[in-house]
Amino acid sequence: MVNTAAEMKAIVDRAVYPPVGSRSFGPFNAPFASLDPRDGFAEYYQRAKGGGVAVLPIIESSEGVKNCEEILAMEGVTGCFIGPYDLRLSLGVPGGIDGPEQVMRC
């Protein structure tokens, strides 16, 4: 769960290679993240460095919604997930799947 741009910055810093982040490169393990067994560490590094690492924060609090534009605008962020049930609770709306208009009002 991400609530602020500062939290997101710390996540991006650890998930993305320089110059955007400071993720270290492990040439012996990183290539195994590839679905193509022919890829070596050089191919993986180039793909990951060029935006091939998905960084997807989960927004599931009222604070996260309040700060979502700043969170999602950060370089290195590639999308997001919404945690609807925890978000409902954070907004003071009882749990369940009904009443989306209640959540939108909050």
PLM features per residue range, with description:
Residues 1-106:
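Expand to "…catalyze enediolate/carbanion chemistry for C-C bond making/breaking, isomerization
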